[in-house]
From Swiss-Prot:
This is Succinyl-CoA:3-ketoacid coenzyme A transferase 1, mitochondrial. Homodimer. Only one subunit is competent to transfer the CoA moiety to the acceptor carboxylate (3-oxo acid). It comes from Sus scrofa (Pig). Pathway: Ketone metabolism; succinyl-CoA degradation; acetoacetyl-CoA from succinyl-CoA: step 1/1. Belongs to the 3-oxoacid CoA-transferase family.
Length: 520
């Protein structure tokens, strides 16, 4: 008992010395390492915190879109002028903010990311051969970073099997004439329990630039709402992690169970001088807004698809919805039904768009739109989000497509040499055999070009992954061996009409019915 009392007394003395900034006492040293390498170093100037990042370094940069990006640390890199960086980030912000600023200043040599998005300069530099881009599925990117922080050198995943990710040949760098200068390498493939998986290697950075909400004087960190995204796994996956925060508080301000990142991962801390917290897509609703259900059913193509897609929801279901038609279909979920909407940037329990006075830059969906959450919602990191997705815990994923093949192959992420948006989280979303994959799209492309075809001509997002196709003309069930079966047909159209506008053959269900629409 006397020994325990002595230990307790010395622990209190050590904690007191730590809070006051004093040195550890000799008594403390008898119980704890005196190595200063474990102590978080605090900075008052962001430039000082990053000035030793050398040319050619690999830098992990947190954030999703513009949400949770380390604004001050990115600005500091602009001032240091460091060049030839390999930047690992989900995307590259926008043209004039976030990592887009470092692209404009030509400080980045290679991007490892999942999504080009709406950053026109990013896309221009890539297609012009000025920038190397290693496009990586979003969930795979998150897991590669997580593995790097956990000391796992590589892992197997079903994401990307049967695509350019597995086969190799995806352009990393173009020549000036549009030919491929550097192509991705093939991945090793193994089979487990009848399913194919590819080998992905972990990512570790020389430095990680992370944005958090608050830190205490010990270096423990917390995040706010959906701003944790890639920040959390990146914190653990670099030789030197630099965290910028909005506020530094006293030790003891956080309950231990409320700490998101323990101090062991945080090497440097700086309080951000100022924050713009720009919003990429401001989406709001008005007080009087109600679900848009006016007009005759099916009076336009888009509405027709939306109102059929809404019938895919079931009570208690967990669903991930792509931007556009899939997300709009959620407006028609029955009030007698509960559907839990998951967003891959780290939200479970998405709600409607906010009122103007509810807008929060730290709360966005995967489409970078401002959102709200419903009671019972939760926030988590990107690696946790894709554990839900890849692990088959999400019942339904609904997304758009450029092309779908007869046997359920999906293409929706690039047109080589012309359009490069990146795969984002789509490859992960369609990778689990436990998740129903529903494609919503217009039946034909411009010029009546086929989108439903014998074989996709564009690079695949997933192989034999689609279970159902919903267009303005028809609904097909998809079997990976037997092909398509027409199960619903829009009123006024015939089977021959569908044959003319479809680029492959299909069976017709003996129970063919008129195309259904959600009731209003």
């Amino acid at each position: 008992m006397a020994a325990l009392t002595l230990l307790s007394s010395r622990l209190r003395l050590c904690a007191s010395a730590y809070r006051s900034g004093g040195a550890w006492s000799q008594g403390c040293a008898g119980y704890f390492s005196t190595s200063t390498r474990r102590h978080t170093k605090f900075y008052t100037d962001a430039v000082e915190a990053v000035k030793d990042i050398p040319n050619g370094a690999t830098v992990l940069v947190g954030g999703f879109g513009l949400c949770g990006i380390p604004e001050n640390l990115i600005g500091a890199l602009l001032k240091t002028g460091v060049k030839e960086l390999t930047a690992v980030s989900n995307n590259a912000g926008v043209d004039n903010f976030g990592l887009g600023l470092l692209l404009q200043s030509k400080q980045i040599k290679r991007m490892i990311s999942s999504y080009v998005g709406e950053n026109a300069e990013f896309e221009r530099q890539y297609l012009a051969g000025e920038l190397e881009v290693e496009l990586t599925p979003q969930g795979t990117l998150a897991e590669r970073i997580r593995a790097g922080g956990a000391g796992v050198p590589a892992f197997y995943t079903s994401t990307g099997y049967g695509t350019l990710v597995q086969e190799g040949g995806s352009p990393i760098k173009y020549n000036k004439d549009g030919s491929i200068a550097i192509a991705s390498k093939p991945r090793e493939v193994r089979e487990f329990n009848g399913q194919h998986f590819i080998l992905e290697e972990a990512i570790r950075g020389d430095f990680a630039l992370v944005k958090a909400w608050k830190a205490d004087q010990a270096g423990n960190v917390t995040f706010r709402k959906s701003a944790r995204n890639f920040n959390l796994p990146m914190c653990k996956a670099a030789e030197t992690t630099v965290v910028e925060v909005e506020e530094i508080v006293d030790i003891g301000s956080f309950a231990p169970e409320d700490i998101h990142i323990p101090k062991i991962y945080v090497h440097r801390l700086v309080k951000g001088e100022k924050y713009e917290k720009r919003i990429e897509r401001l989406s709001v609703r008005k007080e009087e807004d109600v679900k848009t259900r006016s007009g005759k059913l099916g009076d336009n193509v888009r509405e027709r698809i939306i109102k059929r897609a809404a019938l895919e929801f079931e009570d208690g279901m967990y669903a991930n919805l792509g931007i556009g038609i899939p997300l709009l279909a959620s407006n028609f979920i029955s009030p007698n039904m509960t559907v839990h909407l998951q967003s891959e940037n780290g939200i479970l329990g998405l709600g409607p768009y906010p009122l103007q006075n509810e807008v929060d830059a730290d709360l966005i969906n995967a489409g970078k739109e401002t959102v709200t959450v419903l009671p019972g919602a939760s926030y988590f990191s990107s690696d946790e989000s894709f554990a839900m997705i890849r692990g088959g815990h999400v019942n339904l994923t609904m997304l758009g497509a450029m092309q779908v093949s007869k046997y359920g192959d999906l293409a929706n992420w690039m047109i080589p040499g012309k359009l490069v948006k990146g795969m984002g989280g789509a490859m992960d979303l369609v990778s689990s055999a436990k998740t129903k994959v529903v494609v919503t799209m217009e039946h034909s492309a411009k010029g009546n070009a086929h989108k439903i075809m014998e074989k996709c001509t564009l690079p695949l997002t997933g192989k034999q992954c689609v279970n159902r196709i919903i267009t303005e003309k028809a609904v097909f069930d998809v079997d990976s061996k037997k092909g398509l079966t027409l199960i619903e047909l829009w009123e006024g159209l015939t089977v021959d009409d569908i044959k003319k506008s479809t680029g492959c053959d299909f069976a017709v269900s003996p129970k063919l019915i008129p195309m259904q629409q959600v009731t209003t």
